[in-house]
């Protein structure tokens, strides 16, 4: 497990229901439950800032999963973060027509076009092949 924090504009609480720690998730626009109850969205900006301050100057990955190309609520501040952090990398998984990487961070970015579920399965298969405990034959090859 790596330290992480998740920003999302989804309001369905699926991340929490999938086992992610609610303290590490910020549904920026609130949840449907909050909306139905007339509550304001939680503001975890201070939590995000505290998390990011611990990694200033260190290796940092911003992983974007399926954020529409026009959604600037999350994309813009994270892209600016990557631009200003020397050891940050921006990785985006999205449908080809939704991929957007500005020129300022193009050299620090990876775009993976396609269906997110398929891409994640493919990455998992590749990672399993690189696992140090994978079975090897008598020549030491996997």
Functional labels for PLM-detected ranges:
Residues 1-142:
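Conserved catalytic alpha/beta core of Sir2/sirtuin-type deacylases, generalized to analogous enzyme cores
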């Amino acid at each position: 497990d790596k330290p992480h924090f998740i920003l999302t504009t989804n309001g369905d609480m699926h991340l929490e229901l999938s086992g992610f720690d609610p303290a590490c998730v910020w549904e920026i626009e609130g949840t449907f439950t909050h909306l139905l109850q007339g509550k304001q969205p939680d503001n975890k900006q201070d939590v995000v800032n505290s998390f990011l301050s611990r990694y200033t100057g260190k290796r940092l990955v911003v992983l974007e999963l399926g954020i529409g190309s026009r959604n600037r609520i999350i994309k813009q501040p994270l892209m600016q973060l990557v631009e200003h952090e020397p050891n940050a990398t921006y990785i985006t998984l999205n449908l080809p027509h939704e991929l957007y990487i500005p020129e300022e961070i193009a050299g620090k970015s990876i775009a993976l076009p396609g269906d997110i579920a398929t891409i994640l399965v493919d990455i998992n298969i590749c990672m399993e092949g690189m696992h140090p405990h994978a079975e090897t034959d008598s020549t030491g090859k996997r």
